[in-house]
């Protein structure tokens, strides 16, 4: 046989065989390079993961700080609102004994005596004016009778048997109570009805 007449599988020409073998070699080379990972690529991937983690921590930190600032702002607003709302509490507490004295003066005044009528009227007007002024600032009087005893606004002094008032209800007021913008600043001292034995 001549050198040109070599046996080829399935009638392929020698150039085709060389090309096929060359393609197989090229196909094998990428597999070999895939096994050899460039250390720089691994380092880049590691750094990217660290960067993503740091960004997530930073975002979480920023959100946490924003939430804390918002909570602080709300608390401050509430504190300021309460300070405005209840700033008068100390002043009102100092004023309550004066109001009580005017109430007691009216209770003991001889209203049937014509000589005392001008004084009684003056005390009534003074008390009314004073109560009108404190009401403008959110003060309300607790002086209702025949209502259920409420420990938030009533202080029970005694229990008295009664047919007219249901047991557990306020029978009488010994000393009026007061609230400032819904908060009790002095509980009303009351007698409470109980069933007859």
Swiss-Prot record:
Result of altering residue 157 to A: No effect in ability to interact with DnaK
Q: Where is this site: Interaction with DnaK?
A: 183
> What would changing residue 183 to A do, according to UniProt?
Loss of ability to interact with DnaK
Protein's name in the database: Protein GrpE
Q: Source species, please? A: Escherichia coli (strain K12)
Q: Which GO terms describe its molecular function?
A: adenyl-nucleotide exchange factor activity; protein domain specific binding; protein homodimerization activity; protein-folding chaperone binding; unfolded protein binding
Whether Secreted counts among this entry's keywords is no
Under Pfam families, the record lists: GrpE
Q: What is the lineage of its organism?
A: Bacteria, Pseudomonadati, Pseudomonadota, Gammaproteobacteria, Enterobacterales
Question: Is Metal-binding tagged as a keyword?
Answer: no
PANTHER family recorded for this chain? GRPE PROTEIN, GRPE PROTEIN HOMOLOG, MITOCHONDRIAL
- GO BP terms in the entry: chaperone cofactor-dependent protein refolding; protein unfolding; protein-containing complex assembly; response to heat
Keywords for this entry? Chaperone, Cytoplasm, Stress response
Q: Where in the cell is it found?
A: Cytoplasm
Please describe, based on the UniProt annotation, the reported consequence of changing residue 107 to A: No effect in ability to interact with DnaK
Oligomeric and partner information:
Homodimer.
Which stretches does the entry tag as region Disordered?
Answer: 1-40
The induction text for this entry reads:
By the sigma(32) subunit of RNA polymerase.
Which stretch is the leader sequence? none
Query: Family per UniProt?
Result: Belongs to the GrpE family.
> What's a GO cellular component annotated to this UniProt protein?
protein-containing complex
- PROSITE patterns cross-referenced by the UniProt entry: GRPE
Phenotype when changing residue 174 to A: No effect in ability to interact with DnaK
Q: What does this protein do?
A: Participates actively in the response to hyperosmotic and heat shock by preventing the aggregation of stress-denatured proteins, in association with DnaK and GrpE. It is the nucleotide exchange factor for DnaK and may function as a thermosensor. Unfolded proteins bind initially to DnaJ; upon interaction with the DnaJ-bound protein, DnaK hydrolyzes its bound ATP, resulting in the formation of a stable complex. GrpE releases ADP from DnaK; ATP binding to DnaK triggers the release of the substrate protein, thus completing the reaction cycle.
């Amino acid at each position: 046989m001549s050198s040109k007449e070599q046996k080829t599988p399935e009638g392929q020409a020698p150039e085709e065989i060389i090309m096929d073998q060359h393609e197989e070699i090229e196909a094998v080379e990428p597999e070999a390079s895939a096994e050899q990972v460039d250390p720089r690529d691994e380092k880049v991937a590691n750094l990217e993961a660290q960067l993503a983690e740091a960004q997530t921590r930073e975002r979480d930190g920023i959100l946490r700080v924003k939430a804390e600032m918002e909570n602080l702002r709300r608390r401050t607003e509430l504190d300021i609102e309460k300070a405005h709302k209840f700033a008068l509490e100390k002043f009102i507490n100092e004023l309550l004994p004066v109001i009580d004295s005017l109430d007691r003066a009216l209770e003991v005044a001889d209203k049937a005596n014509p000589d005392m009528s001008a004084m009684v009227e003056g005390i009534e007007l003074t008390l009314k004016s004073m109560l009108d002024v404190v009401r403008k600032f959110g003060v309300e009087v607790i002086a209702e009778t025949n209502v259920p005893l409420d420990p938030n606004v009533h202080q029970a002094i005694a229990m008295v048997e009664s047919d007219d008032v249901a047991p557990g209800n306020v029978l009488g007021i010994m000393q009026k109570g007061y609230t400032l913008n819904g908060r009790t600043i002095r509980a009303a001292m009351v007698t409470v009805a109980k069933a007859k034995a």
